[in-house]
Amino acid sequence: MAPFLVLFLAGVVSASRGDREPVYRDCVTVCDQNNCTGFRLRDFRAQQPLYMRLTGWTCLDDCRYKCMWYTVSLYLKEGHEVPQFHGKWPFSRFLFFQEPASALASFLNGVASLLMLFRYRSSVPSSCQMYRTCLAFSMVSVNAWFWSTIFHTRDTALTEKMDYFCASSVILHSIYLCCMRTFGLQYPSIANAFGAFLVLLFACHISYLTLGRFDYSYNMAANTSFGIVNLMWWLAWCMWRRFHQPYLWKCVLVVVLLQSLALLELLDFPPVMWILDAHALWHFSTIPLHFLFYSFLRDDSLYLLKVNHDDDIPKLD
């Protein structure tokens, strides 16, 4: 979900201390030459588990994984801090899961979002003005968590981009959701025009990051800007309507908690037991917020139905 999160996307560097280490580079080169050519490559493929082949793990990937741990062991033996590799901490692979804890947390976030989607559909009549917009937001959110799960399962150039792009789509769609709720019901033409602008903005954002080298700094700055707009808009509306709609505390609490929990990312410590890091903790901590946010969406939709129903009742003089 994370519709208000400013720090939803953190830029990563393309190179880190670990993968710049000559020991690591030499290890990968030797491993590649000795194991990833000719009959040895055939032996590797014959011994490689099916689930590893299906998820795209290559001989070179296996060399990098083994050399990463070889380098880490040397660092620890000599009393140095654990280094990062390619912008990430070293994680202990489980089956084909590259980052098991983050993958599990992303999956659970997706399940929570999907369950709340079903609950919203079962408790809110389709005649509600915000019904389709809320369902669309829910599906965008589920899709984002799906790609987050895939990315943490197997980090490739494609899965990384899909994770970033889908996360951006959640923030932008949350802005549209807020626009619909604050202006769109009274002025549909404004909401339609703004929605078209957001689609164009999203297309330009993706094009810039896809056509050239992926600009992590721009990506972080752009999504931070999207997040600030989203955050301030929702908070302003909640503060303005707080005396008329008492359930808005749920929306405010989600906003505040998401921003507070994002601070976990700043801890950035080596994974505990080589599995659980700050990023995974952040993802785990957002799971309960789905229930609170969708409770707000349900209450707000039912409130709109009640207001419209009361307006339709003829007044007796």
Swiss-Prot record:
Protein name: GPI-specific phospholipase A2-like PGAP3
Cytoplasmic side: 115-132, 181-189, 241-251, 294-317
Keyword annotations from UniProtKB, A to Z: Glycoprotein, Golgi apparatus, GPI-anchor biosynthesis, Hydrolase, Membrane, Signal, Transmembrane, Transmembrane helix
Pfam families the UniProt entry points to: Per1 (PF04080)
Signal peptide: 1-18
Residues bearing glycans: 35
Biological processes per GO annotation: GPI anchor biosynthetic process; GPI anchor metabolic process
Gene (name only): pgap3
GO cellular component: endoplasmic reticulum membrane; Golgi membrane
